[in-house]
Amino acid sequence: MAAVDSFYLLYREIARSCNCYMEALALVGAWYTARKSITVICDFYSLVRLHFIPRLGSRPDLIKQYGRWAVISGATDGIGKAYAEELASHGLNVILISQEEEKLQAAAKHIADTYRVETLVLVADFSRGREIYAPIREALRDRDIGILVNDVGAFYPYPQYFSQVPEDTLWDIVNVNIAAASLMVHIVLPGMVERKKGAIVTVSSGSCCKPTPQLAAFSASKAYLDHFSRALQYEYASKGIFVQSLIPFYVTSSGAAPASFLHRCPWLAPSPRVYAQHAVSTLGISKRTTGYWSHSIQFLFAQYMPEWLWVWGANLLNRSLRKEALSCQA
């Protein structure tokens, strides 16, 4: 009995001496909970402010805000084509750049007939490197280029381990994903600075958030575009230029990997047209955005999750996409 009493007294003494530490831990816990709660509330507010409120008001006058002409690279498919149509619906004349002349002419005719704007097509294969930029520079000379959309991109045929990626694909990723955006900005930026207005939108990818296995070179090239755009914004915001890094996740376009389960989830992977409508509404508002509300939710999860969990999920998804692509080829 004496031993029990002694243990009880010892326990009370230890508990009394630890009270101050327990109170401190409680304060730390309360501070952490409050901080996370405020972060979640701010993220939710940002989501609503960026993706829903702008679409409730009148459409902005993009011509007055930026200029009369828009240049879109990669304009024959997917996001690029849809973005060109959305800008044309705002009354901007559009210059479409791609390597497929027949599809370019068809897209230009459709836009001109539908939206009653001027169109110009430039046939350019960005994978050929430096030689293609002189004709582009000459064609854009003395035009009021208000918006540049860098959407042209090279992708793996399907997710692959790096050693299995063809060497030509790696060169395409360097020339098309990295060099094309850099050189196109270099061509149009001086005119924008002279006019003290303009917008540059560079399409990155959700895979740039963290290292993405089975898309190693592609995700690294998109990380370059993200950092490039953010740095340009710091350099040229004071000169009236708005630079946006656009970070989409999956969109149901022909250029993306064939993922039928994503096609069955339009809220998760919207069509290019729906995506472009939302993305254009963020122009002039957000310097770095996914462009679509459900993609912003995915981006928040990606930002908060540990890297090992991202890698695990990426491996799981990309294995599934590779398996589906290979089964389609069989």
From Swiss-Prot:
Subcellular location field: Mitochondrion
Superkingdom classification of source: Eukaryota
Region of interest (Required for mitochondria translocation), residue spans: 2-82
Key words, A-Z: Acetylation, Mitochondrion, NADP
DNA repair among keywords: no
Modified residues (N-acetylalanine): 2
Record-given protein name: Inactive hydroxysteroid dehydrogenase-like protein 1
Organism: Mus musculus
